[in-house]
Amino acid sequence: MKMAIVGGPTAVGKTDLMVEVCEEINAEIVSMDSRQIYRYMDIGTAKPTPEQRKRVPHHMIDILDPDEYYNAFLYRKDSLKAVEDILKRGKIPVYVGGTGLYADALVRGIFEGVPADENIRKELRELERREPGILRKMLEEFDPEAATRIHPNDLKRTIRALEVYMKTGRRISELQKETKGDDRFFIIVLTRERYDLYDRINRRVDRMVEMGLVDEVKRLLSMGYSKDLNSMKTIGYKEVIEYLEGKYDFEKMVHLIKRNTRHFARRQIIWFKRYENAIWYNLTFVSKEELKKTLKELIVKNFSV
């Protein structure tokens, strides 16, 4: 049995397509999105609509409040529990989403062997506060391989890599290689030509704003959720917060959401290119009906192996 992971950049059309595919093969969707796990964050995370969720059951959506901690290790554990439930009911589980870290946790396993040390983390954060950029330089010196995989702006993962090195004397990149992978999955990546994808992103952002994204953010803030939460730094939310703070006008806010989403989509595509055996489909050139037929056959065939 091999389960499909259907990944790809934001706004490529994963949800709409896979709801139709899964509906026709008696499958259920396991969301692979690190933002759709949060309650109350519906518009800005482009969650499946109630109608789509009624047509095909979705798992790993609305499981946490915005201030709750979560990581890829917990995602793997919880999503595999959902898979067990789906299998018991005789259905096919299909992972759908664009969070590359979650895909890695499933396919490559995840290293979680060194407990967090808040004292070390506090020291590292303070060091970075006093000398911005110093942690990146330390990572490049102590673990060059990890530095090539961790984005320069990803302070959280940089601190984790340094924390592991400081506690064990070993590089996190080495420890991760010792983590066993999982051969129960195969990866399908949906993509589009850049002009097509960027146009879809721009139109999606316009729809989000029309649907009430600003009011959604206001409501979250009024519920007591801090702008400093990791969840509230999601693209779309952080720009609205800065707009509400008067840092720029409405038009600039919309422009920044579109630009930052386009940059994010580009990073997602780069991430999924790391999977050598992934099967790619370009939705700009393939008809929806033709692709639906191909995906249904591919998912069912691999699941039956």
Curated annotation (Swiss-Prot):
Region (Interaction with substrate tRNA): 33-36
Cofactor entry: Mg(2+)
Superkingdom, taxonomy of origin: Bacteria
Signal sequence bounds: none
Pfam families: IPPT (PF01715)
Protein EC: 2.5.1.75
Swiss-Prot/TrEMBL catalytic activity: adenosine(37) in tRNA + dimethylallyl diphosphate = N(6)-dimethylallyladenosine(37) in tRNA + diphosphate
Function (record text): Catalyzes the transfer of a dimethylallyl group onto the adenine at position 37 in tRNAs that read codons beginning with uridine, leading to the formation of N6-(dimethylallyl)adenosine (i(6)A).
PANTHER family per record: TRNA DIMETHYLALLYLTRANSFERASE
Subunit structure: Monomer.
Similarity remark: Belongs to the IPP transferase family.
Name assigned to this protein: tRNA dimethylallyltransferase
Lineage: Bacteria, Thermotogati, Thermotogota, Thermotogae, Thermotogales
